């Protein structure tokens, strides 16, 4: 069996083993947020890309918790939240590409940044990504046009799959505006795609991440 096959099996096994909320309509809604798609304008817009195999467009490991914490910090009426969906299906195979995701997933994130700025020109954007979603955000943000990128005030990355390759930062984006969370024992942050239980622990960082993002827009 090839190393790639072993890693795919490990990712799939972990996805099956990870507890997922029951498939009720209410719980699925908690894993999705579509404020940008729905044309909602707030002072702050949070755009998040979930990890591989996560349900909804926000996932369940950390995305919804950051959104909730950010609303608690800034006021629920001041924050819009949007998950990256559409062409970003969070499937496993794109992790093995050179960008650790695929072009259509990167474009899905870029489209949301562009839509947020076009529809809500006064909003301040903050962003986040987990696992494959961190690669989606990394690749999208570094290539944004300057007038759109300057609207992105802060980014949080959890289990950053390109942490080693990109030196713990997003190329062509201010390092001080990025906070990377890499749990002890998460081998993904060491340049591998080997999934360990540590990779699923980033919910504990949601509050701190929200505080970091809030500090960038206050």
From Swiss-Prot:
Reactions catalysed, as given in the entry: cutin + H2O = cutin monomers
Major site of localization recorded for this protein: secreted
Annotated site residue numbers, Transition state stabilizer: 52, 132
Entry-linked InterPro entries: AB_hydrolase_fold, Cutinase/axe, CUTINASE_1, CUTINASE_2, Cutinase_monf
Keyword Secreted: yes
Keyword entries, A-Z: Disulfide bond, Hydrolase, Secreted, Serine esterase, Signal
Disulfide bridge partners, by residue number: 41-120, 67-81, 182-189
Listed PROSITE patterns: CUTINASE_1 (PS00155), CUTINASE_2 (PS00931)
Annotated localization: Secreted
MF (Gene Ontology): cutinase activity
Signal sequence residues: 1-17
UniProt keyword Lyase, yes or no: no
GO biological process: carbohydrate catabolic process
Family matches, as Pfam families: Cutinase
E.C. no: 3.1.1.74
Any one GO cellular component localisation term in the record: extracellular region
Residues forming the catalytic site: 131 (nucleophile), 186, 199 (proton donor/acceptor)
Similarity comment: Belongs to the cutinase family.
Function statement: Catalyzes the hydrolysis of complex carboxylic polyesters found in the cell wall of plants. Degrades cutin, a macromolecule that forms the structure of the plant cuticle.
UniProt cross-references to PANTHER family, sorted A to Z: CUTINASE 1-RELATED, CUTINASE 2-RELATED
Protein name per the record: Probable cutinase 3
Organism: Aspergillus terreus (strain NIH 2624 / FGSC A1156)
């Amino acid at each position: 069996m090839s190393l790639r096959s072993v890693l795919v099996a490990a990712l799939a096994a972990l996805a099956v083993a990870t507890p997922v909320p029951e498939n009720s309509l209410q719980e699925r809604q908690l894993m999705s947020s579509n404020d940008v798609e729905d044309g909602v304008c707030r002072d702050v817009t949070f755009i998040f890309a979930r990890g591989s195999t996560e349900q909804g467009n926000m996932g369940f490991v950390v995305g919804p918790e950051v959104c909730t914490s950010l609303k608690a910090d800034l006021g629920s009426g001041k924050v819009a939240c949007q998950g990256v969906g559409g062409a970003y299906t969070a499937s496993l195979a794109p992790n093995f590409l050179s960008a650790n995701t695929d072009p259509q997933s990167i474009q899905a994130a870029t489209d949301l940044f562009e839509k947020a700025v076009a529809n809500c020109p006064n909003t301040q954007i903050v962003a986040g990504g987990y696992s494959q979603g961190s690669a989606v955000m990394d690749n999208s943000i570094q290539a944004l046009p300057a007038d759109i990128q300057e609207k992105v005030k802060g980014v949080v990355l959890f289990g950053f799959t390109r942490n080693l390759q990109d030196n713990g930062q997003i190329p062509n984006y201010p390092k001080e505006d990025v906070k990377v969370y890499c749990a002890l024992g998460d081998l993904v942050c060491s340049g591998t795609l080997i999934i360990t239980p540590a990779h699923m622990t980033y919910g504990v960082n949601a509050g701190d991440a929200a505080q970091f993002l809030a500090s960038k827009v206050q």
